[in-house]
A protein has these predicted regions:
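Conserved AMP-binding/adenylate-forming core of the ANL superfamily
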Residues: 17-61, 65-69, 86-91, 146-152, ...
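Adenylate-forming
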Residues: 104-118, 216, 243-244, 257-263
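Conserved AMP-binding A3 loop
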Residues: 28-30, 170-194
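Structural core segment of the AMP-binding/adenylate-forming
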Residues: 73-148
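AMP-dependent adenylate-forming
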Residues: 6-27, 134-141
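Flexible, low-complexity linker/hinge segments
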Residues: 1-2, 122, 141-169
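A short helix-loop-beta submotif of the ANL/AMP-binding
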Residues: 52-53, 59-79, 83-87, 96-101, ...
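Conserved AMP-binding/adenylation subdomain of ANL enzymes
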Residues: 193-211, 219-262
Length: 263
């Protein structure tokens, strides 16, 4: 498997009924594969195509997975935005990466993300085609930016093609360095899928009765690869929105978790 669409198709056809548990719902790999193709259609209608950037300012939720798959289909680039980002960091991402759309939730923990977005320089937000709200709250109104819900994308007809190639740029992560601003690192689809398979094999994720706890944020490299390694194995996993020690400890017991990562 050398592309994200191939990875999702394999998981859906070989382990389609394997479950993904989130705080709000339970869904399957088969559901995810279809949702990714629906979201891809919705993003394509917004003008997202090969090489375009999609900002992910999200905790570990279902929409993160659907949007990742959609970017894979379109040959677009998923830009990981740390959930701790505030006005300065978000403005920096928009200036340097120029995402066509940004996906977000109205709050993460005790932080009101809508207030943060409203502080962003309007001229910068106007460079985004749309802001995609990925929770069930009322859609926000931001001057100079079109706002819509993730559910709007999910209601699209699924695409029946894929523009993603092995060497298509796929994801951007930021890393700390010697300068005040983060550095950006770009990975293609083949690099990501092959590494996830290597991690899957190393950790023996295909072992009988395997159950994974996604305790690390997907906006970081470790959490991101741990997620895709689970998908590569077609293994069921538990996906809390953010790490809370007591909650995750309970998940370890309730779901009989065999694989968990920390950092």
């Amino acid at each position: 498997m050398d592309t994200i669409p191939q990875l999702l198709t394999y998981a859906a056809t070989s382990y389609g009924d394997s479950k993904i548990y989130s705080p709000d719902e339970t869904f399957t790999y088969k559901d995810l594969e279809l949702e990714a193709r629906r979201v891809a259609k919705g993003l394509a209608r917004l003008g997202v195509g090969p090489g375009d950037r999609v900002g992910f300012w999200l905790p570990n939720i279902r929409a993160y997975l659907g949007l990742l798959g959609a970017c894979g289909h379109l040959g677009a680039i998923a830009v990981a935005m740390n959930t701790r980002f505030r006005k300065a960091e978000i403005e920096d991402v928009i200036r340097r990466v120029e995402p066509k759309v940004i996906a977000f939730v109205s709050s993460i923990g005790r932080t009101n993300n809508i207030d943060v977005i409203k502080e962003v320089e309007p001229a910068l937000l106007s460079k985004c085609t749309a802001l995609i709200q990925c929770d069930k709250k009322n859609v926000i109104h931001i001057p100079n930016a079109e706002c819509m819900t993730y559910d709007t994308l999910v209601r699209s007809e699924p695409i029946n093609y894929s523009l993603g190639e092995p060497h298509s740029p796929f994801c951007i992560f930021n890393t700390s360095g010697t300068t005040s601003l983060p550095k950006f690192v770009l990975h293609n689809q083949q690099q990501v899928t092959r590494h996830s398979t290597e991690v899957m094999d190393l950790l023996k994720m295909k072992a009988p009765e395997a159950m994974v706890l996604q305790s690390l944020p997907f906006c970081g490299v470790f959490g991101f690869i741990f997620l895709l390694s689970a998908v590569s194995a077609g293994v069921p996993f538990v996906m809390p929105k953010i790490f809370e020690a007591k909650e995750c400890a309970q998940h370890l017991i309730n779901y009989k978790v065999t694989h968990v990562a920390g950092g």
